[in-house]
């Protein structure tokens, strides 16, 4: 199926239900990091920082992982292929976990490496990228740097990926990025909706690749949700990405992987950096994948703290999108920048701007219960009504 660049771009104009948001590139990603650094610089000296800005697991990895890391120091001088266990052992561990073949797996230095390589592998100047808005910015950032066309489809009224216009936009695309749960909105689509979406895209545009990113899979509590890994294994041009940065608490170790049919993910294998996972990360990942109890405990902990945080914000009149991650997308009724800076001045660092909702919404990661109780007190201080000169109550926040 041959689709020209002009044809791909024309589809954006002709789809009456599509809402296209200006693409965010590498410059925007760098600006996002600058926003986080700027907020942290406002934390007063001597105040213990509560960092709930980056969707990290506040407890870090479990004991089995820490023990595995400590045990690898004698092999720190070895390349990953010469260590025991090596990267092949990690691939085998993932294969065993999902009862699949090693050829169905590609390892990455975090799932971000895989996402970047997916844009390089599957998009071209003629066949662009389709993604949500807001959604994780990695893929559009790479596409913009490559000057490949991008269609960003605004989320629906429930802050979920808007599947109908995404299906229409996918015609002639090289890659569709389907973030499920979606970051930053934390919303999720059920298994049937995902399968229907993939089936429709396959019908409309058989050569288009669908990347289903399940970074927050382990936090989902919606009974309608299921991993798309079985779907990816039976369907050409579909693959799933996972990371150990979130529920496994290994954001600093940088381990991710892709799962799909061998012919689908082969281009990713060709693009990955040699020795892309360290000997420490390999050992840590193998230990983490074997520790199912730790993940169950982390899911339960996050669910309880998330419920507390939702209630605390709701009492302030701040509504959250239905969350199935370790973060919330919250309507604070004012620009995220103002809210972020006001919170930082009291020691709480929340998330960056997420266009097109940066004037009203903020992403708040879920910390420990103690952290979120303290953060809730700061939110009350920042968002509380203030008295006007005539004694009336104003809905404006107190930006202390």
Model-identified regions with their sequence ranges:
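PLP-dependent aminotransferase-like
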Residues: 121-179
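N-terminal small-domain helix-loop-helix segment of the aminotransferase-like
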Residues: 26-110, 117
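Conserved PLP-binding catalytic core of the aspartate aminotransferase-like
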Residues: 155, 302-303, 314-346, 366, ...
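Active-site pre-lysine segment of PLP-dependent enzymes
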Residues: 163-171, 184-210, 214-247, 263
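PLP-dependent enzyme catalytic core of the Aspartate aminotransferase-like
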Residues: 342-346, 351, 355-400
């Amino acid at each position: 199926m041959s689709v020209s660049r002009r044809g791909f771009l024309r589809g954006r104009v002709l789809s009456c239900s599509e809402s296209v948001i200006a693409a965010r590139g590498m410059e925007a990603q760098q600006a996002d990091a600058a926003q986080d650094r700027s907020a942290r610089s406002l934390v007063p000296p001597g105040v213990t920082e509560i960092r709930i800005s980056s969707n990290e697991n506040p407890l870090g990895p479990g004991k089995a992982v820490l023990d595995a890391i400590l045990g690898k120091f004698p092999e720190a001088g070895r390349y990953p292929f010469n260590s025991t266990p090596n990267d092949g052992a990690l691939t085998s561990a993932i294969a065993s976990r999902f009862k699949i073949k090693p050829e169905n797996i590609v390892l990455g230095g975090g799932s971000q490496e895989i996402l970047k390589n997916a844009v390089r592998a599957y998009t071209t100047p003629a066949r662009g990228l389709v993604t949500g808005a807001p959604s994780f910015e990695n893929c559009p950032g790479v596409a913009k740097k490559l000057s490949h066309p991008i269609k960003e489809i605004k989320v629906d009224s429930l802050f979920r990926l808007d599947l109908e216009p995404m299906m229409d936009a996918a015609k002639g695309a090289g890659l569709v990025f389907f973030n499920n749960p979606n970051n930053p909105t934390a919303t999720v689509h059920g298994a049937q909706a995902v399968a229907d979406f993939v089936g429709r895209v396959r019908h409309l545009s058989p050569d288009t690749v669908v990347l289903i990113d399940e970074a927050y899979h382990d936090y989902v509590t919606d009974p309608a949700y299921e991993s798309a890994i079985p779907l990816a294994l039976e369907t050409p041009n579909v693959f799933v990405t996972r990371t150990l940065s979130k529920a496994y608490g290994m954001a600093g170790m940088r381990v991710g992987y892709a799962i799909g049919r061998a012919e689908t993910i082969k281009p990713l294998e060709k693009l990955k950096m040699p020795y892309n996972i360290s000997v420490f990360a390999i050992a840590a990942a193998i230990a983490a994948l074997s520790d199912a109890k730790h993940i169950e405990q982390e899911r339960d902990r996050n669910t309880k703290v998330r419920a507390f945080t939702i209630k605390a914000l709701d009492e302030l009149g701040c509504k959250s999108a239905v969350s199935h991650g370790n973060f919330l997308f919250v309507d604070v009724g004012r620009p995220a920048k103002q809210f972020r800076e006001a919170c930082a001045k009291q020691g709480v660092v929340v998330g960056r701007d997420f266009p097109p909702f940066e004037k009203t919404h903020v992403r708040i990661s879920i910390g420990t219960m103690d952290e979120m109780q303290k953060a809730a007190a700061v939110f009350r201080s920042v968002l509380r009504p203030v008295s006007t000169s005539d004694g009336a109550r104003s809905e404006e926040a107190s930006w202390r």
